Amino acid sequence: MKLLEDKILKEGILLEGNILKVDSFLNHQMDVKLFNEIGKEFKRRFEGCNINKILTIEASGIGIATIVSQYFDFCPVVFAKKVDAANMDKDTYESKVHSFTKNKTYNVRVSKKYINKGDKILLIDDFLANGCAALGLIDIIKQGGAELAGVGIAIEKGFQKGRKELEKVGAKVESLAILDKIENDKVYFK
């Protein structure tokens, strides 16, 4: 998606360890106009998949998933929680997820009330690196007896193993901007 690639080139900041900082428009301050175009593009790519629910993980995927929902008849958006909360149901589906950026493992949870047999779920997230978050969410979908319709990613680090890991479990992966490499303080797209 050229619009997203242009935004990355213009506003993205490269940090040590191949970390692309896009907090000015994607995962801290949100460019809602861009998100709207992202929603339209995911609708185009997942047209006909009969999606009735969107699943993401807190926190950075929530904004994108909410906008994407508009293009799938305002279907519910569910997000997996990384932290225990007093108001969280005790009856949950759980999976372990390792964060590439934070180098930390989380036990993510979704209430059993929100993932059901017969659901056709689209996973949405801001980044795909090693695939750990998406694999954890796919595990939760399976625990609930629901069906994975596909995985929609804003930015994929194509030089990491995430896509291969997701394709191994049969996931349809659609990424809007695929980084081919980060070299000499420059981003290259596939």
From Swiss-Prot:
Keyword set includes Signal: no
Lineage: superkingdom: Bacteria
Localization in the cell: Cytoplasm
Residues holding xanthine: L20, N27, K157
Gene Ontology MF term list: xanthine phosphoribosyltransferase activity
Pfam families: Pribosyltran
The keyword Secreted is assigned to this record: no
EC number: 2.4.2.22
One of the GO biological process terms: xanthine metabolic process
Any one GO CC term of the record: cytoplasm
Catalytic activity, reaction form: XMP + diphosphate = xanthine + 5-phospho-alpha-D-ribose 1-diphosphate
Main location: cytoplasm
Residues noted as binding 5-phospho-alpha-D-ribose 1-diphosphate in the record, renumbered to the chain: A129, N130, G131, C132, A133
Pathway(s) of this molecule: Purine metabolism; XMP biosynthesis via salvage pathway; XMP from xanthine: step 1/1
Keywords: Cytoplasm, Glycosyltransferase, Purine salvage, Transferase
Protein's job: Converts the preformed base xanthine, a product of nucleic acid breakdown, to xanthosine 5'-monophosphate (XMP), so it can be reused for RNA or DNA synthesis.
Subunit note: Homodimer.
HAMAP family, A to Z: XPRTase
Family, per entry: Belongs to the purine/pyrimidine phosphoribosyltransferase family. Xpt subfamily.
Name listed for the protein in its UniProt record: Xanthine phosphoribosyltransferase 2
Gene field: xpt2
